[in-house]
Amino acid sequence: MDFLDQVLADRELRTALAGGLDAEPTPTARILANAIADAFGPGALAVIHYGSHAQRSDARADSAHDFFVIVERYHDAYLSLTSAIDTSVGPRTAEVLAHVLPPNIHAIRAPDGRDGRSKCAVLTLRGLRLAARMETADHFTQGRLFQNVQLLWARDDQSREDVSSALVEMRIRTYQWGQPFLPQSFDAETYCRVLLETSFSAEVRPEGDDRVTQLLDAQRVALLPVYSALLDGLTRHGILERGKDGYRQVVFPPLAERRRRQRYFRISKARGTVRWAKHIALYDGWLDYVVQKIARRSGVAVELTERERRWPFIFLWPKAILFLRTRPQQRRMRK
């Protein structure tokens, strides 16, 4: 029996944990979400807004908006997408790649390209539910969707309910993957910080030491009430107890569980690194996107020669290896 079964069945708690999903987005995010839904056609079930624009965490006006597009079936979704916009691969190739290290990532612009651009992760409802239940091989989806996100568009009431339910379960199960890294006693802010730090450790990222603090500060108003409600719910169900510092674990996880979770996150990082090859094949303008993100997040300006732009798979390796060895995240790990 899942030790979180009673928590997952707590209707009052689930209502509290849906907080923020219906928050009002920016006009640009709304326009992009509607354009994305149109592009994926009748097989689109929902569009979830996540990332720096959703969190209001230092996003620039010209940076891409991040979305998860939840679809019924990859086949139908990609037939619609490839007929609506120009893509780097055909529908059959995209469908095949969707089953290899999901999700696929695509760049999609609003009509006429006037209202920004979006970076879309495409996942079936089944795939979202597997991620919510911690039944995926890596942390890509969970690491993004446990944060402040908005459900901007849904095909119908049932689709909205299905996707909201999966997002709420994802929030509940943060305790499942975060518990081994928590101190014996903690408060809601420490809980959120540990979740962010643990998720960041599972990916190769360009950010410096202060990125987790920036994210926590930007999402504080949205995240702390949600995860305070979760911790209160875990206390009601006997998984936590009240302590002088907020909450206290009733049963501290054994060392074997911590090692198992550490192994999961190491595998997740390896899968995330390999997944970049798929992003390159699918994401139009991937090279400029990566260079801009490195500059924005790490402060490192990467100047590319014409030869590196034309044949990146041949000539870009020395700069890529140098950055991976000297990025702020790597320097922090060596301390």
What role is predicted for each listed range?
Residues M1-A39, G43, I48, A54-D62, ...:
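Catalytic core of pol beta-like nucleotidyltransferases
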Residues I70:
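Short hydrophobic/aromatic beta-strand micro-patches
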